[in-house]
Amino acid sequence: DSSTSRGLGDVYKRQALTISAKIKIPFYPVPMTMQTFVVLFLGVSLGYKIGLASVGLYLLEGILGLPVFSNSPEKGVGLIYFTGPTMGYLIGFLTASYLASKVNNRDSFLMVLTKLTIATSTIYILGLLWLGTLIGWDKPIFAFGAKPFLLAEIFKIMLLALITKKIIKIRNFI
């Protein structure tokens, strides 16, 4: 039955986000997760409607207390954790997934890189805005909330840009 397989597919999409948030990959200067990669991947591979729905449901699961977020405790803490220092980044997942869905097969490699960079940037812009509001603008917000992750983000953007055209061909075929 197609509704059962669609339901299972929705579970797998959110599980991919959860798993990508929990696995730490050694990287310099800080370990990275593949969470932002998966957020962009969902937008590219599923389009904006299903990509946004998948990310939105993932965020809702975290808000409701499931331990889906990176560094969230085993029992989760729901809204309290969500409204902490990472809330802006988490909300940025929605804009990033949407913007990543705008990549298409006619885009040059440079355009794909540009679109994915803009999508990723929205995560950090919203994240830094919230972080600054939460901890104070007198702190080195960029040094805390973006600089340690720049190399990892460049790596993930390049990786996704290299496989994006194939992903879109598969999406269009299905």
What are the functions of these language-model segments?
Residues 10-14, 70-72, 119, 135-136:
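Short hydrophobic/aromatic-rich motifs at helix boundaries and adjacent loops
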Residues 21-99:
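Alpha-helical membrane segments and adjacent membrane-interface helices in multi-pass membrane proteins
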Residues 4, 30, 34, 48-53, ...:
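Structural motif marking the loop-to-transmembrane transition
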Residues 1-12:
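Single conserved hydrophobic/aromatic residue that forms the stacking wall/gate
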Residues 102, 106-174:
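Membrane-embedded alpha-helical hairpins and interfacial helices in multi-pass inner-membrane proteins
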Residues 13-17, 39, 43, 54-62, ...:
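Alpha-helical transmembrane segments in multi-pass membrane proteins
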